[in-house]
Regions:
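Acidic/polar surface patches and capping/hinge elements
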Residues: 9-467
Length: 467
């Protein structure tokens, strides 16, 4: 913590941000949020933190608002005195999350309110005076309201409750997840352990992780504000219609069209399917473990996007980032992930590519089984690849790519920590993991990485200049 002159409280350390990122991970798991919804939530939360710290002249941050799509109108910083960035950020975060999580569990909102109050109290202890606290709280409240007003126009509510009728054509994707894949075994009054009928997935209560730990508490939230992930229904078919945070539109970094569906020998699609099947027919245990490590199913590790947010949370103390720098890293990473899901979903439900399990069982091997259950949305491009490409582009841009690290994001759910030589090495592994898992053809992961790097580059352009 760095103490500055002029009698002001010291600049807060990065824990002020990682406290919020850890709370977000807990929330996404406990509320059972699907990947797109979780990404939207985290991006608005990240923006609230960034804009809160940017209001403090000491932070060196400028507001991102003028450069965001559909530029939100943010309140002017008070001119009659200084504000404390940590207090502004905590209050803005509370306002934003209390609204976005209003249909969640009561315990979720209590955690948000308690953390905000604790951070304000810490800043008082650090020496922020009553007048500055009052100005900061008022500005944080106004800032949170402005972000919510912008969020209300992103198209999310227009997609709630809209019926989607699957095409039910052989050449179009159809959800293969069924209720009998998930067989509950009650562990306690708070949760169920869910095993799957897939023989390739070994299930132990000590190592449940992505293999199927689903919270099973009563949840009143309907589809309007906080829908829970349901693997037996197509996930968010209209998500590609949402307004991106930074991209001018969802197609700004669109991948090339995938090959047309064809079961004929010699066709491009048949060749793609054959190459996939040949690569996974005999899968060594080491590659199976890669597939499981990056599965990131909802509830287990908090979705694919939150895997990278967990990495961000690890990097903040390791790099000794203060709160403003941590808020910038968190905000840009979460917005890159959010835009990645919007762009990915636009193409997924446009191309409607049949998943490998369906194609292989039809054409090559009726007995084929995947390593993990196939996700409930179309195949192309790979969402893991797009959002990983986007997140890593931001991480490399802000932290460099020479940092070795150990990814411990899934230790608490039974997966061993995994070392990586660089962010780019992890990015390549997560992309290939989707082939090993049996849920993507190779073009989906390669084109997905390209799309993700394009998205991440556009988001990274918002970062403050580096010396």
């Amino acid at each position: 913590m760095v103490t500055l002159a002029c009698g002001r409280a010291p600049v807060p350390d990065g824990a002020y941000v990682t406290d919020w990122s850890r709370l977000a991970l807990i929330t996404v798991r406990s509320e059972r949020l699907g990947p797109p919804v979780a990404a939207r939530l985290s991006a608005y939360a990240g923006l609230a933190l960034h804009e809160g710290y940017a209001a403090d002249v000491r932070s060196g941050l400028g507001s991102l608002a003028p450069r965001l799509t559909g530029a939100p109108v943010m309140p002017a910083v008070p001119s009659e005195g200084t504000v404390d960035g940590a207090i502004v950020a905590a209050v803005a975060e509370r306002v934003v999350l209390d609204s976005l999580l209003r249909d969640g569990f009561a315990s979720t909102v209590r955690r948000v309110d308690s953390l905000a109050a604790a951070q304000v109290a810490r800043r008082r202890t650090d020496g922020v005076g009553d007048d500055e606290v009052a100005r900061s709280e008022a500005h944080g409240t106004a800032l949170g309201a402005a972000i919510l007003a912008w969020a209300a126009t992103d198209g999310f509510f227009a997609t709630r409750g809209r019926e989607w009728t699957p095409p039910r054509r052989r050449d179009q994707w159809e959800n293969t997840a069924t209720l009998d894949q998930y067989v509950p075994q009650t562990l306690s009054g708070q949760s169920d352990f869910v095993s799957t009928t897939n023989p390739n997935v070994r299930l132990d209560t000590e190592t449940a992780s992505e293999k199927g730990l689903f919270t099973n508490r009563p949840k009143a939230a309907g589809p309007t504000t906080l829908p829970a992930f349901n693997p037996t229904r197509p996930t968010e078919p209209y998500w590609g219609e949402l307004r991106p945070f930074v991209l001018p539109d969802a197609d700004a970094c669109a991948p090339p069209p995938p090959p047309a569906y064809d079961e004929a020998l010699g066709s491009a699609f048949h060749a793609m399917g054959r190459a996939f099947y040949d690569s996974v027919r005999v899968l060594p245990d080491s590659l199976r473990q890669v597939a499981l490590f990056w599965a990131d199913n909802p509830v287990a590790t908090g979705t694919p996007g939150f895997h990278w947010i967990s990495v961000v949370t690890q990097m903040i103390p390791r790099r000794g980032l203060d709160a403003p720098a941590a808020a910038e890293l968190y905000a840009l990473t979460t917005m890159a992930i959010a835009d990645a899901f919007i762009g990915t979903w636009r193409e997924k439900y446009r191309s409607m590519v049949v998943r490998p399990v369906a194609y292989v069982q039809r054409v090559f091997d009726p007995a084929y089984r995947t390593v993990i259950p196939t996700p409930p949305f179309p195949e192309y491009p790979s969402g893991h690849s797009v959002q990983s490409g986007a997140a890593v582009e931001v991480l490399i841009g802000l932290l460099g790519d020479t940092l070795t690290y150990v990814d411990s994001s899934q230790v608490d759910v039974g997966q061993p920590a995994r070392p990586f030589a660089s962010f780019s090495a992890a990015r390549e592994e997560v992309a290939w993991s989707r082939v090993y898992a049996g849920v993507h053809y190779l073009p989906a992961v390669l084109d997905g990485l390209t799309q993700g790097r394009c998205i991440g580059g556009q988001v990274l352009a918002l970062a403050r200049p580096r010396g």
